[in-house]
């Protein structure tokens, strides 16, 4: 199993995928369609030579999700609202399809929310993202692809996520979950149980 979990992308993404075609899952940012970070995220992948196959889970049936994942070299789960993302994954059943394919060897790249959902829980980011955006989501269990609970943007340099919020997150959830604080520009490369921190 291979994961590249980023706070906001990383120069090693194309190397990690080892191919060209990537299923791009944008659902976490569906309420931010015109936000600059959304376009910047897509451009970051394209600049590394990756071809993006758009895969919006909220209006793609499971058979089409499966077909797309079978035709690409990797899957990229974009950033945005973590709780909304998990709600979409869970309500569509695509969480099970993606988890199965990644466990079978499909490379998984997460960015921010996409990295958080790969872990054991998304509860630990509830001070950063609002659970209220996903009122029907009652279970915060993540995809369970790693035991680490990623906390993105941990340098506190983004106004939306000041260092005080990061510190409160560690105080509130640090004893309950194995937190991994990532700054923008950092990534976790996880392969067959081995974890490497990339700067």
UniProtKB/Swiss-Prot annotation:
Q: Which residues form the active site?
A: 112, 153
Pfam families listed in its UniProt record: Peptidase_S51
Which positions carry the signal peptide feature in this UniProt record?
none
Disulfide pairings: none
A GO molecular-function annotation? serine-type peptidase activity
Q: Where are the transmembrane segments?
A: none
Gene3D superfamilies named among the record's database cross-references: 3.40.50.880
Keyword ATP-binding among record annotations: no
SUPFAM superfamilies given in the database record: Class I glutamine amidotransferase-like
Q: What is its EC number?
A: 3.4.21.-
Tell me, what is an example of a GO biological process annotation in this record? proteolysis
- InterPro entries in the record, alphabetically? Class_I_gatase-like (IPR029062), Peptidase_S51 (IPR005320)
Keyword terms of this UniProt record: Hydrolase, Protease, Serine protease
Cite the PANTHER family for this sequence.
Answer: ALPHA-ASPARTYL DIPEPTIDASE, PROTEASE S51 ALPHA-ASPARTYL DIPEPTIDASE
Q: Which family does it belong to?
A: Belongs to the peptidase S51 family.
| Full protein name | Uncharacterized peptidase DR_1070
Organism listed in the record:
Deinococcus radiodurans (strain ATCC 13939 / DSM 20539 / JCM 16871 / CCUG 27074 / LMG 4051 / NBRC 15346 / NCIMB 9279 / VKM B-1422 / R1)
């Amino acid at each position: 199993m291979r994961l590249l979990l980023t706070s906001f992308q990383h120069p090693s993404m194309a190397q990690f995928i080892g191919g060209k075609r990537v299923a791009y899952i944008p659902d976490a940012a569906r309420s931010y369609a015109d936000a600059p970070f959304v376009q910047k995220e897509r451009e970051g992948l394209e600049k590394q030579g990756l071809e993006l196959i758009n895969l919006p889970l909220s209006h793609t049936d499971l058979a089409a999700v499966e077909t797309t994942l079978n035709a690409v070299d990797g899957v990229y789960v974009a950033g945005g609202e973590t709780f909304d993302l998990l709600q979409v994954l869970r309500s569509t059943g695509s969480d099970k399809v993606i988890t199965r394919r990644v466990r079978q060897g499909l490379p998984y790249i997460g960015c921010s929310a996409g990295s958080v959902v790969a872990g054991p829980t998304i509860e630990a980011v509830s001070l950063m993202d609002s659970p209220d955006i996903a009122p029907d989501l009652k279970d915060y269990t993540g995809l369970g692809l790693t035991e680490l609970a990623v906390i993105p943007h941990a340098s506190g340099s983004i106004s939306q996520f000041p260092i005080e919020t990061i510190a409160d997150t560690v105080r509130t959830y640090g004893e309950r979950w194995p937190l991994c604080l990532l700054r923008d520009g950092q990534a976790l490369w996880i392969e067959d149980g081995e974890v490497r921190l990339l700067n």
